[in-house]
Each structure stands twice: as C-alpha cells, then as structure tokens.
C-alpha cells in the first residue's frame, strides 16, 4: 500500500533512482495505491545525464509493493521493495527497459507496454 510521502525505487532506466509519492490518483479522498495504480511522484534521486532530473514531478505506475497481494486462486505474492515505473502523460513508460519482476495484475489494469518490457512476469 502506497500513500503520500512513501519512498519508492524506480524500476526502469529513465534516470531516476528514488521517488516520493505526492498524490494517489483516482478519487478525491483516495488514500492508498497498490499494484497497477497511477500515482504522482517527485524525483528525489537521479543519475547524471538521465531523461529526468531531481525535483521533476511526474506520474508513475506502481509495479511492486511490500504489502501482500491476494490472488483469486488463494495464493499470495509479496515483494521485498516498493517500486514504480515512470510514465508520461500518454501513459507510456519514459524508460526503454524495466528492471526486476512485475506481477500479472498489471495486465488487468491495461499496462501492456510495461509487461512487454519486463524481464519476468509473476
């Protein structure tokens, strides 16, 4: 569960390393985001010569959360770190590569571009 002020890793090669959630999109009183949800983030740490720089405000898709995710078959999936992928206003990833596994739940939220770039889908 991601809320305001949550720090996340960036799972792509956009140049950002760490971001902080500053808003969860989807309703005026929406408090938490989970896998596949879109959040507004501020870039807190970035590498030199990247596509983004520290202080930029962008949208991101949450791809990994530490909170347990229950599936319809009763299984549970959980990741070690919270992570997100930066997207532009057309909901396309800013980076050209995705690092680490992503869950199948992204398919239901129509983030097919992220799934196709990911090295592993759980």
Swiss-Prot record:
GO terms for molecular function: large ribosomal subunit rRNA binding; structural constituent of ribosome. CDD domains: Ribosomal_uL14. GO terms for cellular component: cytosolic large ribosomal subunit. Pfam families: Ribosomal_L14. Keywords: Ribonucleoprotein, Ribosomal protein, RNA-binding, rRNA-binding. GO terms for biological process: translation. InterPro entries: Ribosomal_uL14, Ribosomal_uL14_bac-type, Ribosomal_uL14_CS, Ribosomal_uL14_sf. It comes from the Bacteria. Belongs to the universal ribosomal protein uL14 family. Binds to 23S rRNA. Forms part of two intersubunit bridges in the 70S ribosome. HAMAP family: Ribosomal_uL14. Part of the 50S ribosomal subunit. Forms a cluster with proteins L3 and L19. In the 70S ribosome, L14 and L19 interact and together make contacts with the 16S rRNA in bridges B5 and B8. This is Large ribosomal subunit protein uL14. It comes from Bradyrhizobium diazoefficiens (strain JCM 10833 / BCRC 13528 / IAM 13628 / NBRC 14792 / USDA 110).
């Amino acid at each position: 569960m991601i809320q305001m002020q949550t720090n996340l890793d960036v799972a792509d090669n956009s140049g950002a390393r760490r971001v902080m959630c500053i808003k969860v999109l989807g309703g005026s009183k929406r408090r938490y985001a989970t896998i596949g949800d879109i959040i507004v983030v501020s870039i807190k740490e970035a590498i030199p010569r990247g596509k983004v720089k520290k202080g930029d405000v962008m949208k991101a898709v949450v791809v990994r959360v530490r909170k347990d995710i229950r599936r319809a078959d009763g299984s549970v999936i959980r990741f070690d770190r919270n992570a997100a992928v930066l997207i532009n206003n057309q909901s396309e990833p800013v980076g050209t590569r995705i690092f680490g596994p992503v869950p199948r739940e992204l398919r239901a939220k129509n983030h097919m571009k992220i799934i196709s770039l990911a090295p592993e889908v759980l």
